[in-house]
Amino acid sequence: VISHHFETPWTEHAFLEPECAVAFYDEDGDVFIYSTDQSAHQTLHECSLVLGTDKVKVQNALVGGGFGGKEDMTVQHLAALLTYVTKKPVKVKLTRAESLLVHPKRHPFYMDMTMGCDEHGNIMGVKATVFSDTGAYASLGGPVLERACTHAAGPYHYENFEIEGTAYYTNNPPAGAFRGFGVTQTCFATETLLNMMADKVGITPWEIRYRNAIRPGEVLPNGQIVDESTGLIETLEAVKEDYEAALAEGKPVGIGCAMKNAGVGVGIPDTGRVKLIVED
């Protein structure tokens, strides 16, 4: 059994194109917003609330890089409000320094994890407590934490997994969406713990992953049944020779495995209801 504490920091998205919005009144008398954000429908909703009218239109234009960093509203409401008040076209664009200050970053995580294995390196169970700093505003702190916990067990086959996650409001800068969506942080902790366990058991990091790798038809610790498209075993086998050769040459080589969701489903129960009326 091995226990360890892990911490990960804020991370900047570093997209090339800073946030920008252009607003004006169109021929229908609506406030029309060209926006470089990743969430046009949310921008429409929030700008409508700001202006107190549903006569608002939003169109994405020249978004450029985002990586999750442009999912939150930054300048769109400012351009819209100024147009609403002045009746003139308005453009609001952040400088690089302003962009770095304003948009949410990757969540800092604080994680305590315990992993147990048998003498052969087969994972018997993992228990974890995870805290994330979502800053002064929630942003996507809830969904990020949900993903972080759902995938923290890794792409491995074992049954005993317990994790508790909490996102906290703090007086720090807001944190939100970023590529990996929380999985990056917990994956780092799980994979590091697995390396520590391999060293304790006396096998290579490759071997402990191969012994525990999920295979089609097996059930992940989060309850998901793995389908035939899963190729973790084949992937590990494909890199084995090069990995071992690099180790033999004393090269600083590492290995890690991870899984991440595609889509937005989180296994919410799919319930149905029917109403029966009995008539004489």
Model-derived regions: residue spans:
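Structural alpha/beta core scaffold segments of enzyme domains
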Residues: 1-280
